[in-house]
Amino acid sequence: MSRVLRWALVVCCVCAAIALGAAAWYRLSQPIVLTVAVGPADFDDAARISAFARKLVAGGSPVRLSIVPSSGPTDALDRLKKGEAQLAVVRSDGSGSEQAQAVALLHTDPVVIVAPEKTGIESFGDLKGKTIGVVGPPGANDSLVRTLRQHYRAPGETKMLAATPFEVSTAVRTRAVDALLFVVPTTRGVKLGESWAAVRSASRRKLAFVSLDEAEALAAANPAYEAGEIEAGQFGGSPSLPEESVTTIQVATYLVANRNISADAITALARTLFQERQAVSGEAPIANLIKAASTEKDAVYPLHPGAKVYYAGEETSLMERYGDWLFYGPMLLGALGSGLLVVLRFLGFREDRDQTALLARIREVDLLDQRSSDAC
């Protein structure tokens, strides 16, 4: 093989190696983009996730979020199951999925039930045979209403209502519903107080809170819920809403991830969620409510390994992560050096011929000298 062909072959190999290295570096340096299903767009969770997504970009995080709009937590979970999203904002009383693992507990909200005063409705059992107006995303409260009716043995009708004061007040004024049920974050207190006043004014009927007196027993039988209270004045207003504490149950909202997502990506995501919650709270106050998801084995959603690493403080340092490279790097460089020598020889580089001839001449002189000594 001529020297020109040898040089051409080596140049091609070097160019290929550089191209592969550049491609690998580009791929490794690009952030991981995770799709997250959340909605509706005008609800708090969508605003919070959007704010976090912008923060991840601004902070140069190795993980980014791409939002997949959904009609609510039920639809979001369905999208995760179908592979249309890698993350989803879901509720603890959803249908669940073996694919979903918890990243963080976003917030825990009280179940609020109200009914017009002087109608004899003081507890959920009084709603037997009556119509409940359910306010919220499509399908989000289906499991909740079904659980309550079964527990209190109070079958009846359900009517879905849009979360607008006009539609809600119209339903109350026309007696299309006997009570209202909704789940609302505590950070929406002022907004709820304003809506409450608007509904009361438009419907010309005073509303009262309905207590769930068997909340402890109900939560014990249904782990998706927790017993709790709506504290007096929790939703503001004048007079305070409510005027005294009301026993109820609470439902949790989680950020869950497909269990096949790498632990490193979820660890980075969890770190940002907690480190930046204060920065995001100005844009989305609900961000202040985020908590660590349960590490218990019987949790509604098992903890994702990546989130577990963050919560346990077991994130690896750069030395721990790249220690093997530092150990084996010199060996690899030595092997590359040996390979370079082979390439140089392949290209025709040899030891200097004059030097080689001189060494041969020295050996001949030594041999003649030795023969002369033997002859003597």
Residue ranges and their predicted role:
Residues 31-33, 62, 75, 82-85, ...:
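Extracytoplasmic
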Residues 224, 228-296:
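Secondary-structure end/capping motifs
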